[in-house]
Amino acid sequence: AVLAEGKISEIHTRFPPEPNGYLHIGRAKAIWINWGTAKKYNGLFNLRYDDTNPVKEDDEYVQAIEEDLRWLGAEPNGGIFYGSDYFDKCYEYAEKLIMEGKAYVDDLTRDEMREYRGADAGKPSRPSPWRDRTPEENLDLFRRMRAGEFQEGEKTLRAKIDLASPNMNMRDPAIYRIKYAEHHRQGSKWCIYPMYDFAHPIQDAIEGITHSMCSLEFENHRPLYNWVIENIFGTAFPKQREFARLNMTNTVMSKRYLRELVEMGIVDGWDDPRMPTLCGLRRRGYTPTSIFTFVREAGISKSDNLIDMRQLEACIRSELDLTAQRRIAVLDPVKLIVDNYPEDKTEYFDVANNPNREANDTTTRKVAFTKELWIENEDFAEVPPPKFKRLTIGGEVRLMGAYIVKCTGVEKNTDGSIAAIHCTADLETGNGNPADGRKVKGTIHWVSAAHAVDAEVRLYDKLFTEANMNAIPEGSDYKDYLNPESVVVCKGCKLEESLKDAKPGEKFQFVRTGFFTPDSKNPGVYNRVVTLRDSFKPAK
């Protein structure tokens, strides 16, 4: 509306992450809203690192955040900025407020300030004994704060607003504090730092942001945001707007918890495929399209909601069903010997890369067939359960894309385990059904033993057993809810020959098994992106 009415010439948004951790999927919602809004209206989108707190920030996170944005395709066409670049301006504006009698240096401790503001049990506020210092005295004290003459917590600069306000954020909030810490960009230049609620609107205004969109917990901060804009710039823009955070089942979004999982070695780094981080989802095999589809389906609202992670899985499953080429992988192999097939013969069958009609993929690949094959252990049963349609002694199955075979017996190891299964092939069925018209109900996948590629396959599942980790009993340890089967490692897997050249980032459907991608850190390892199917019905 403001664009159509001519109040602004273009939409300008920003994404302001604090570089103290890796971005998770909840932050993808903020990126989608801010970047997506700017893109929709041909506007500008900034990436701004909110690095006003010197204690927690690190260049490692700066680089990771930028990599995540570029991977998502959310190009910051308005530029990349740092909140710390505006420290001089923030200080200048703080002095302006002091001289106008709108800010004062307070000697109350943090706990005393909380008591005076009436933060406990909704008590009425009362003015600090130092609220009525003169502008000249406040300016002198503030400059001495900057010069390092006081200890941390000894002095604080507060905005003078409204102690009677029902909104705690308006009861003379702190806008500068003393902090002796090395800043990742500014070094030791500063020993006083602006509070987020003071720095954020200033940064937005300087960059020309028109719409400052943030999560719902900042809704009560909006009056303070507007107060800073009006009292420093005297303008009507930027405008702050809020949206509910995105929460997902069976995981945690708290940076503190995620950091603990990494530091305690419970997960394999921030990019562990079980983590809700964007780098973890990328390593798992999720795509930017699937993540933004999930965020869009979750919707924008002003009420917090918990989204089933299976909805995210449904998004990537739908995408990969169309885009992923099919390959054959045997995760728990047992040898199948075709006794009536020549020892020295190799035959190649043409197999469709993606039989899904909607994929419009008519390409095929050559798959080698030899006397000795690998099949899945679970596709054979000496004593089959009811309705078992796979291979049994005396029974027939179709080897997917190749011959019908009949099991004639098994070889066993001394411990009773199966060493090899023997069968004969109906060599007239390589290109179709048997001549006598008999029906074979079961079809199983296989890999030529002579051409197989060895691999490790990791089957990932939800990280926590509890769906709503925000609702666990107070005082309980979130780590008690870790899923002991969040990853199952399958070693000694046998993959078809074409996968020897597969690269990280490529996605495949292992037929009858799931969707997989090569791990970006460990050659010869494949990560399960998602299972082939699920009973979950995504929201429309």
Where in the sequence are the language-model features?
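N-terminal catalytic cores of NTP/NDP-binding nucleotidyl/phosphoryl-transfer enzymes
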Residues: 4-66, 182-215
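Intrinsically disordered or highly flexible coil/loop and linker segments, enriched in small
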Residues: 8-9, 103, 151, 168, ...
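Secondary-structure transition/capping motifs at alpha-helix termini
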Residues: 4-7, 36-44, 70-77, 205, ...
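Long, charged, mostly alpha-helical binding arms that flank functional sites
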Residues: 238-315, 319
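Conserved short loop/turn motifs at secondary-structure junctions
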Residues: 17-19, 48-56, 79-88, 111-112, ...
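Core subunits and conserved enzymes of cellular information-processing
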Residues: 218-222, 226-228, 292, 296-299, ...
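Active-site cores that bind ATP or allylic diphosphates and position pyrophosphate for catalysis
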Residues: 51-53, 59, 96-258, 316, ...
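A glycine-rich helix N-cap at a beta->alpha junction
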Residues: 61-88, 93-94, 101-104
